[in-house]
Amino acid sequence: MGEGILGREDMPTLIENPTIIQAAGTTPKKIREYAGRVNSGHTQVSVAHMTSPEGWEEPGQRPEFEEITVVLRGMLRVEHEGGVLDVREGQMVVAKAGEWIRYRTPEPGGADYIAVCVPAFSPATVHRDVDSP
């Protein structure tokens, strides 16, 4: 077998550390990308651990990728064209490609969550609103 992006294609690849990525929105959020365009060269999927403080919010977006989010701690508020979902610890939300969504962490303590994007997250395909925070 040949060499892939991360090494030999016939063996599992250990990713020892994530890449810390600058976040959009107010009140800095920590993004640790484990798999994706930046840390591992994956273009078909990205996996990131997010830590968002109380009061964090980002601009609305209409991404070209599906985003699957599992909340590990706290509550993640997901605004969408049909209303609002409060996603709590142990719950998951799926935002389909092309849907308008906006994420916030309004409650004390913020939230920790895992975001999986298919295909991988890209600033060029997230399509953030220009007129929101």
Regions of interest found by a model, annotated:
Residues 47-50, 94, 108-125:
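A short hydrophobic beta-strand segment most commonly corresponding to one strand
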Residues 1-44, 59, 125-133:
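A short, N-terminal "cap"/entry segment at the start of jelly-roll beta-barrel domains
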Residues 58-60, 78-79, 95, 101-108, ...:
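Short beta-strand His + acidic residue motifs that chelate non-heme Fe in jelly-roll/DSBH
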Residues 36-37, 57-63, 85, 104-106, ...:
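Short histidine-centered beta-strand/loop micro-motifs
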Residues 49-53, 62-78, 116:
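Short, conserved beta-strand element in jelly-roll/cupin
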Residues 82-98:
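Short acidic-glycine-tyrosine-enriched beta hairpin
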Residues 40-43, 52-56, 73-76, 84, ...:
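Short, charged/polar surface micro-motifs in flexible loops or helix N-caps
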